[in-house]
């Protein structure tokens, strides 16, 4: 990553001069502290360590977020907007309230590194660019090429041939396309992919630009949208989808494809690789075809969208650090990590697309025939309602369009508060390197499940607990809903508890381990005392009620996926019980649903030099 390395020397010296204004949620009082919110914990395990590696002398804290701009609206309401924010599902419409608080990228050099089509939908009516996409993930049809060859069926190269292919497989008793239409994102995909020629037309681009910047009701071009729903309906018929497909979830659709009961599925490059590992067949990707021309397009979405707090512009050195973090993300290696491997469409002119192992899309990539999905939050539910209406026969094309339009412009009902928090706890590190908000949440969940101890990674807790009334949806934003984890209970002795914590600090995950104070685990019911080493931390002691843990005594301990997997390595035969369908997020929401106060934070960690 040559560009990032070039900046490193300048950054190290610049950080010593930083003076400015604290801008992040729960940030430390040091002026050079930069807070970066990443929308899922996969990013905490790959891109965060990589950035730390590039900038070892920078004080950069990564905190888990959610795939919802409302999290940042919540922070903004309490005057604690982070320095850097990310989401995947994004539309300018969803972030209107944040607009006055976000930095405009338009005047910065970073925009010149993007292809024009990549920022086309990110400009507001004033020409400002407050969000930028970070690399693209193709979401296209995955075809079983071996099955095509077995039946002498040609892989389609245009929409007419696609229709013929579907009919040929249907006539042979094989489902042409098993799509998981029980999922909202697939219904959203099917509308935009079926009418991709309309969405990429001048009329479609014009509507999209207006919709992305609409501060109120989204205006619909009836002529355009009648065509869109006509083509959506036609695609459903041509693909031989029926009302039974309404209940096909991701697992069912995948299994049909793996077993050769369907000829086509859909997904990302990582999905294709997983399918390839399960199948003795050659797979190939097929783009989505326009119904109005011979054009074809790669339907894709950014791995993440990123925004900067406007306050960064008041501190040039800190802004330079933030821009270098962004530059690190859009480097070739950064994009590979963010996109989780191969199959990355670079949106940047100086980084090549990494599609060598993803056959079938060569011409579209070469011609930049790429469509970035429209992903306003309401469009997911609106798409599901409309497509299910068409499939069930309860709606014709016009009724489906009207339902979609109504859902997109529906008014959000005012949500009632479910709890009035009497105390405020910060998600930032306290003077002992603990997080009071995370401690409060975990202790509440532990006590609700009658466990004596609990140990979880730090990357399940997103927000401070703010004093005052709070709705259920905002309570839910305090934990990482988009990176949720089941909860487990197990009884082990004190020696095994000690070994569990020790292993967590050194080898929590083959791709992730604790290197900075920001990555230390969250514990409850016990206090872990750790020593700060040059390349991480080591466990010195564990106390319970100010006494050393009894190595022979049995304790019930609450675990998550990560801590459970570590325990399994230590003691493969231990009986670990999953707590039904309960997740960390659902347990927290349920605990607060009756208006009770959360448990007070515990003094659960101490770091010795």
Predicted region positions:
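Extracytoplasmic/periplasmic solute-binding protein
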Residues: 130, 163-216
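Hinge/lid segment of periplasmic solute-binding proteins
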Residues: 88-140, 154, 163, 190, ...
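Extracytoplasmic/periplasmic substrate-recognition and gating elements
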Residues: 277-340
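Glycine-centered hinge/linker elements that transmit conformational signals in sensory
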Residues: 211-245
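Catalytic centers of hydrolytic enzymes
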Residues: 414-609
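Extracytoplasmic "Venus flytrap"/periplasmic binding protein-like
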Residues: 53-117, 146-151, 157, 256, ...
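A structural signal for short loop-to-beta-strand junctions that line the ligand-binding cleft
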Residues: 74-76, 82-83, 111-146, 175-181, ...
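C-terminal capping/gating helix-and-loop segments adjacent to ligand/active sites or protein-protein/ligand interfaces
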Residues: 43, 61, 300, 339-412
